[in-house]
């Protein structure tokens, strides 16, 4: 940008950098606003493609039918002073666009023409910000050419309108018979008319200050006094140039912790800047946000911002958009919004609502269209805030902020103390008048929350109408606190004699602001008081870490979450995944000592340190008890001291070196200023030298550049360059050079950003998931929790929604992904109906598989449409967004997400119809890479559908495989089956005779754990040899195999009529996706081999003592690991107890070792030995032969458990009874006692050989020590294992 003479000085030490005037250029005349023209072009192109514009018009084609007074015309930057300053190059496009976001506006004397003030922000590509403050007012148009042009436009418009809206002849006759009442449209036309002979035409003009810091109240006062000077009948004491020159060149920027007083046209202006150990500068009224939205809505919006949802603010007041946006981001301290931030979205950037990235933007409303007529490209993850109507729309599945009720209560108390109802007030003037009536002396600090002494506003009266506050009342009453008025004694140490130099209302705004901000800051200080403990410092040098930081894990999230109270987890697990938290931790790692620290981080860390010193919270002592803010009083006093004792008073405005006659102006018109005196500052600056301390400039300069000065030049340049690169990709839209090629380039950067995000997200999910599975296999340490995994999957769903929303032609429903799926479903149905879609290949393939083996379950077809139907049949899911997320979860669990999406996008005609050319889904290379990244999820097992939708009905298919070789077909009894899972179990279900397959429906059982199968022993041949049972979830396709290999029948095997089978999930075949679940070959199931025809223990595999010890050790180790996992990540304990390598099987091997061989073909089981031992000990007790009390207690417990198991009505057989005894012994921590008891029992000598493990005291003592490690765990048994026994 070309620049003229600099404004003097080489550092941003001045209060203001530029004074700007925008408005109508009478030399170029009336020009249609090209920004609005671009917007109309975009909307017209959407209309041609069958889409509706972003904002639906009240009448079709309104953009072309608007009266000339309602159209927008091109505004220009008419003047700026100085021309340029080196530290803040002037961005003409951005300033012009944001001063008058919709261009020029014309009005007549019949229209309201009140001046309107608004602030704005210009965010540069490197992330730095410049602040603007604009006052828009109306001036009478004196140019005859402009008035004539407007009159001509009206003639043309009326002629077009009459032609377009002329009624048919019949309608004309009908209308002539009516009373001649004007239609609403006609009334509107007349109201908006302009007649050059009788109307006065006014046009908008804007004066603006561009400043390095956001002193909003001071800048507003400067502009309003300047405007008052030109509208007042009496001229100001000095020419306007004197006041503008003074604020540009002679008013310094106050350094941290200082206050400043300078002169406006009519009165003094005061501003103060917080010190480096206070909360950062914030000069917008928090009061207005709570009045407009209410506490509940503010908290919901605050939560959405913290979780980085897309946020769209909507209001017809630019200043409201800015105030809400700035307030929400200020309340985030110490975190900072990292994404697109455009509180006032110019008309030319409406296409940016299509951005598939988190954003916080403000959209101007014309005051006529309601929410239903506002069409937005994507709404699945959108928080929509209609500020003017006190209304907010939230995304689904929004978690609650920790301790929300107590937090809301604390904020509500402060608001009530200032006369602001917590539920908000649509008529803000009422609340403002209450606040104005309060005397400053009534604002008495109570060291906690600034309650008002003797306030006439009864808290109950203020709150009784609000539902949210009603819940708070109940909470407060439970804690014993009354909601009645409290008498607050005045603090004798308060500074009641302290006289501040600003008016009372301004002081109250300062006080309310700091109280609310301190409470919010205190919440984060409490929640993250020990965050430093979990920061993972990099092992490599800073340069290497910075290069690879996106791939580095820099915060121990799992450990941090494991220490948090349970109610905090849904919010915190998602918050830890945000960019703002990642940047916060990056800052912490980059800054090793206080000198290096970012100013915001330094303030936060000092507060954390203070909390620790006060023993409020320590890293080793965590509590979920809500702790109120205690820093309000100190923060208030700091502000009051600065306002009472002004640190510096700038020099007063004075006459400049102007020619005689210059500086005159006509009242009501902002004059053309003398550029020769305003373009440069004073050469010697004698005024500044005389009045402003030189150290101000030096100190301020050092504070602003401290982080850059501490880096060497190469590092600084590198970091700045990267910041610019990131900003130019997806962080911030550039507000200039808005040509179609630039828009296309912006969209291309969005595509690249989406692909990069997809790559990083899939990698993160795989690393975390595979890390956890490695732990289950005994490698590494656990690093993920169930909540965290669920958060990552929810984040993936959000990403998919943003991808499917990018470049949409027609927005239908809140979920773009589900809308696309529905279109695909309709297309397939139509093709199937017309016969154009062949299904022969699928059917033949299925038939061929059915004929492979008779023992196969019917193949489960892989079908995108079928999975959609599963979701559509779930009544609990009501919304399109919920259905899309459920479908994604189901596809991930079935390892079909990439395949399904590839199939969805294979319909190229549909994709072209739904999406514009620049959309991500129409970029072939990026789309292929995206699908490839998703394919990597097939390497891990997710249960993200099963574990989330726990209450839905699931169809299950059962296949029972009996032994054909041993007469299974002659079975005459009536079998039954009962299936158990982690979430519940079925009732006993009768199986029709000779039926081996059946399907049933029940509530989701979760991961299946056991099957109980048995029969009633009826008929001539009531003996059944079952090889295995298979159960398949018909929605997820998960198939579980439950090996048996045992007889069910009296006189067969161990005489059992029922078995408890423990199953495991079968792994899918990786080589062919469509392959249905097959039963693995028999030789792959050792349990089936070992137990298929186990008539006597001699036939079982022989293990030596070392192998037995190893198997018991592994079984116990598996149980120990189970209890060291987070509770939600613990798998099936039943599998660890009764599974193939479980504790029961290992102890069975121990008792079988050295067991004497049976004679005369008599079957002998371990249970026979245990029953004899029971008889022996009962005999001893009857004979009162008691060696010792401890021994007596153990023997009595053993006999009681064996007797109870023998008396159970279940026919579970001798091996089943042994399994039950081991499970009960593990539950009650008695196993090691029983092992010692049985080792000393004389029965052991008769039934075991000398080499038996149980007769080797060394091995027995080793076994006892291993089993003792289970004593510290609370083992809960599945119902199926202990059914029928009450002990």
From Swiss-Prot:
The keyword Phosphoprotein applies. Keywords: Disease variant, Epilepsy, Golgi apparatus, Guanine-nucleotide releasing factor, Membrane, Phosphoprotein, Repeat. Belongs to the RAB6IP1 family. It comes from Homo sapiens (Human). Residues 954-1062 form the PLAT domain. This is DENN domain-containing protein 5A. GO terms for cellular component: cytosol; Golgi membrane; trans-Golgi network. Interacts with RAB6A bound to GTP. InterPro entries: cDENN_dom, dDENN_dom, DEN5A/B, DENN_C, PLAT/LH2_dom, PLAT/LH2_dom_sf, PLAT_RAB6IP1, RUN1_DENND5A. Its main location: Golgi.
